[in-house]
């Protein structure tokens, strides 16, 4: 049986999932900075970007499937990142 996470670990994991969501959305939407440059993975190939998105989608899917969440988490952005990420990867 898996060890139950502490409240601090759950909060840290939820924040880490948010970081993955931000990364996925930045890649998928080709988010740019004020200078018009891509904010993440500027010099990466499409294959490298897809690999990064795929890894992060897998991570947030795994984390969301854990059963010891508190029940007050908002999964809206996570679900959108999963859907958008899978569509991007193809």
PLM ranges: what are they?
Residues 1-90:
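Beta-rich interaction/scaffold domains
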